[in-house]
C-alpha cells in the first residue's frame, strides 16, 4: 500500500503539468471546462483557473498571459476621449463611405474598421449607393458619347468622302474608334449617310489601314439588328463580298464575320450574297489554314446551300466538294469539323454533288471521325455517309469505315444504329469486297443482334435485314453467312418479321433474306419448323389476289403499297418457295398448302420474272410423282409448252424440265415427240438430242445466279431516297423519316390467312394502294 509520503510526492510531480495545461488553454482563448486542466468540482472561471483557493498557482504569470493579446493599455480617461471622438465624426464616416468625393482634401477621419477583410456596417450599407453613382456616371458618359458622335458624324461623313486619302484614313480611324463605344455606335448606325460613306470608302480604298478600319466598323455595327439593316440598305453586302479577296487577314476576318452575321439575322442577305458572287469567293477561301476563320466560312456556305439547289451547283462548280473533304481529312478542330460536315450533309442530298464528294474520298474522310468524342460531329458524319452510301457501292478502300460501322451497331444511341445499318445495307449491295470485309469483322453477328434489339423499330430492322440479305449471297463467304445467321439464333426473329406489324418494305426484304438463307441446306429444316413456308404462301396469295383485283378492274399501271409493288412480293415469295422446295420435306408442306393451282396460274403472268420463278418452283415440286400428276391435272401443259419458246433462257429451261418430269410415266411415243419439241425449242442454234441435255434446269437457281431476281438491273434501293436529307425538312429532322418508306400512323396490318386450301376472299384485309412512293429493286435479293 502506498504511503502518505508517496502520494504527496506524486502530487508534487504532477503539479507543473497541470499549470502548463491551464496556461495552454488560456493562450488559446478557450473556456476551460475543468476536465483537461485537472479541476475537480468547482465552476470554471474566465481565466481558466481551477480551485480559487489553490494558492500555489503563479498569479502574476497567469495575468501576464491573459493580457498578451493587447498591444497597448488604455486608461479610463483615454477610453472616454476616444468614444467622444468617434461620436463627433460619425456623420463624416457615413459621408466618407457613401460620397467620398464630397470630403475636404486631407481631412482625417478615424476608422472603426479593425480588419480590412471585414467591412463595417456603414461600408456595407454604402454599396448600393456606390452602384447607383456609377450607373449615373455611365449614363452621363453614354450621353456625352452619343452627343459627341451626333455632332461629329456629319463632319466625319464629309471627311470620308474627301479626295485626300490621308484625310480619309484619319476619318476612318476615328469612326472605327467611335464604333467601339455603344452610344456612338448607335449614333453611327442611325445615320444612313455615314454607313453609306463607310461602305463606299471600304470598297474603293487602296489603303490597307483604311480598309481595316472601315471593315472593322461594319463588323461592330453588325452586332445589332439595326446595324445589320443599315449595312444591308447601304449596299454593304457586295462591298463585303469584294473584301473577301483582300490579302490582309484582319480585313478578311472582319468581312467574313460581318457577312456571317448578315446571313444569320438579316432577311434578304442570302440572295444578295449569292448575286454578289459570294459563294465562289467563300469556296476559294477554303484553302486558308486558320481553323476559326474556316469554321465561319464553312458555316456561311452551309447557310447559303441549305434548301437552294443553285447554290449547291455553284459550290460544285467552284471545287467545293474536294476542298471540304480535304478539311475533314486534315484538321482536328471540332467546331470546324462540325461546320464542314454540315455543309457536306447538305450537299450529299444533291445528285450532282454526291458522286463528286464520293470521288474526292468523302466516305473515307468522314469515316475518320465516327469515333470522335463529339456526338454532334459523329451524328453529322453518319447522316452524310448514309446519304452518300448509295453512290459509293463501287468505292475501294472502305475497310476501315466498314469495321467502324459494324462496331457502331452496338451503340446505345438509336440514331447511330439506324444510320450505321442503313450505310452497311447500301455499301454491301453488289460489292463483293465489302461483303467479304463485313463478314470477316463479325458483321453477321452484329446485324442479327441489332435486329433482336430493335424489336418493332422498322427504321432499324429493315436496313439491317437488307444488309443481311446482301451478305448471304454471291460472294465466297456467303455460305458461311447463311450458316452464321442460324448459329447466332437469327432464324426465329427473321421469320417473325414476316408477320404483323411488319410493313411491306420490311416484308419484302425479309422474303429476300429467307430465299438466300434457303440456299444453305442446313437451314431448310429450321425454316420449316419456324413456320416460314405457310407464311410465305399466305403472303403470296394475298399479293397475287391484289394484282388480280387491279387487273380485273382495268388497271394497267402497277400500284404501290408503301412503296412496294405487289408483283415484287409475288416474285419474292415464289422465289423463296422455289429454293425451299429443294428439300423433300419442304416440298410436301408446299404441296399440302394447295399451292400447285396458284403456281400454274402464275405461268400466265405477263411479267417474265414471275414466269421464271413459277416454272422454277414447279420444276422442283415435280420431282415427286404425285406432284407432277397434280401439275398436269391443273392444265399446266399448255402454258409450259408456250413458255418453251420464251426469249428468257431460264423460263424456257425450267418449262422444259417440268414437261420432261411430267412425261416420265408417259408412253415412249409421247416422250419421243416431246424430246423433238424440247430439242427444237431449246437448241435452236446447236441442235442436240433431248436425252443428251441431261437434267436441264435442275441446277439453275444455284447460289451464283439467283433465279427470280433481276441480275442485270443496276438500280437498287437507296435508304436516303425515301425522305432522307430533303432540304425542306431541316437537317436536324432528317431522322424523323423511316427507312422503310411507310408513313407513321398509316398502319397496314398483314393479317394471317387461316386456311389457304379454300378459295376465300382475302381482299378485305389488303392494305390500300399508295402510289406516292417509288419502287425499288435490289439485285442482291
Curated annotation (Swiss-Prot):
Q: Name one Pfam family in it.
A: Arm
Instruction: Summarize what the UniProt record says about post-translational modification.
Output: Phosphorylation by gsk3b promotes ubiquitination and subsequent degradation by the proteasome. Ubiquitinated when phosphorylated by gsk3b, leading to its degradation.
List localization entries: Cytoplasm; Nucleus; Cell membrane
Q: Where are the ARM repeats?
A: 141-180, 225-264, 267-306, 351-390, 391-429, 432-473, 479-519, 521-562, 584-623, 625-664
Tell whether Nucleus is among the UniProt keywords.
yes
* GO annotation, cellular component aspect: adherens junction; basal part of cell; catenin complex; cell-cell junction; cytoplasm; intercalated disc; membrane; nucleoplasm
Question: What biological function has been recorded for the protein in this entry?
Answer: Key downstream component of the canonical Wnt signaling pathway. In the absence of Wnt, forms a complex with axin1, axin2, apc, csnk1a1 and gsk3b that promotes phosphorylation on N-terminal Ser and Thr residues and ubiquitination of ctnnb1 and its subsequent degradation by the proteasome. In the presence of Wnt ligand, ctnnb1 is not ubiquitinated and accumulates in the nucleus, where it acts as a coactivator for transcription factors of the TCF/LEF family, leading to activate Wnt responsive genes.
Its subunit composition reads:
Interacts with EP-Cadherin/CDH3. Interacts with custos; the interaction is positively regulated by Wnt stimulation.
Please identify the protein, giving its name as recorded.
Catenin beta-1
